[in-house]
Structure formats: C-alpha cells, structure tokens
Swiss-Prot record:
InterPro entries: PduO/GlcC-like (IPR005624), PduO/GlcC-like_sf (IPR038084), YBR137W-like (IPR010371). It comes from Paraburkholderia xenovorans (strain LB400). Gene3D superfamilies: Haem-degrading domain. Belongs to the UPF0303 family. It holds the Pfam family HbpS-like. Signal peptide: none annotated. This is UPF0303 protein Bxeno_A1932.
Length: 165
C-alpha cells in the first residue's frame, strides 16, 4: 500500500463526494442503502449518519457489537475535529509515525484514526457531519462509505476507489 497515493485518492474522494443539499430524508436514504449493502454482503456493521451534534440515521446489523458502536462514535469524532475522513487522518498519522494522542492531544477514548468515517460535505456549506461504517477492516469500512456516496451522488465508484490492497 502506497500511503502517499492513497492520501491523494482520498483527497479526490473528499473533493468529489459533495451533496448539493442534505436533509434528514437524504440521511435516511444513504443510511438505508448502506444497511442493505452490508446486509446483502453479510457485514456485521454499525452505520451512523449524522450532522455534528445530531444523529440522523443509525443501524446495527446482525453480529455487530458494542465495540462497533464505539468505533463509529470515535471515528465520527475524528471527522468532526479534522473535517477529513478518519482514514486520511490515520494514514497521515502512520506516515508521521505518530498518533492522535501524541500529535494533537486527542484521547483514544474519544477519537479513532481508523478508516470508516467520511465527511458529509454540502456545496456552499462545507463539512456538516459524517457518514460512518464500523465492522470491517478500516480500509474496507472507508471504501464501503465511498461506494455508497458514489451511488447516491452519481459518481463512477471505479474512478474514485482506492487500489486493492
């Protein structure tokens, strides 16, 4: 895995995957889509769609655990703090040989620099929340969210996907 290349692709994902507008109905649509995809693939995931401070969609699939719920919360907190995907932040920490606690003073009990939370961005408003999946390895969590956003925003997922690890 080439971290620098992945960071470039993630930056392109974050730039492209922007909603023209967003409301609770759209949150439900995206969340329900993620739920159905995860269910069809047998993924035991927690799915969380929220604006900062307001949950809009939450779902647990069969086999998901309280740890998945906590990971989703901490990944979402990372997006809220940095306004970037949790995977991008984790890769930057890996590249720097550091951690969120060491570099930014952010406790591991509240923040996670693992993939799976993606910024919920609205044109003209910026990052207003996060869309999070927890249940797979971090790269796969991240890509599942990207796949769902591509489906909802009319982008070709194959053009925005990370290279196979």
């Amino acid at each position: 895995m080439d971290i620098a290349h992945d960071l470039q692709v993630i930056a392109a994902q974050e730039h492209a995957l922007v909603f023209p507008q967003f409301d609770p109905d759209r949150a439900w649509q995206v969340g329900a889509y993620l739920h159905e995809v995860a269910k069809a693939r047998g993924i035991p995931a927690a799915i969380d769609v929220r604006t900062f401070g307001q949950p809009l969609f939450f779902s647990l699939l069969d086999g998901a655990t309280p740890d998945n719920v906590d990971w989703a919360r901490r990944k979402g907190n990372t997006v809220a703090h940095f306004r970037r995907s949790s995977y991008a932040i984790g890769l930057k920490m890996q590249q720097a040989g550091s951690t969120l606690a060491d570099k930014h003073g952010l406790p591991n009990t509240e923040y996670a620099s693992h993939g799976g939370a993606f910024p919920l961005t609205v044109a003209g408003a910026g990052v207003i929340g996060s869309i999070t999946v927890s249940g797979l390895p971090q790269r796969a969590d991240h890509e599942l969210v990207v796949e769902a956003l591509c489906a909802h925003l009319g982008h070709d997922y194959s053009k925005l996907a990370l290279a196979k690890a």
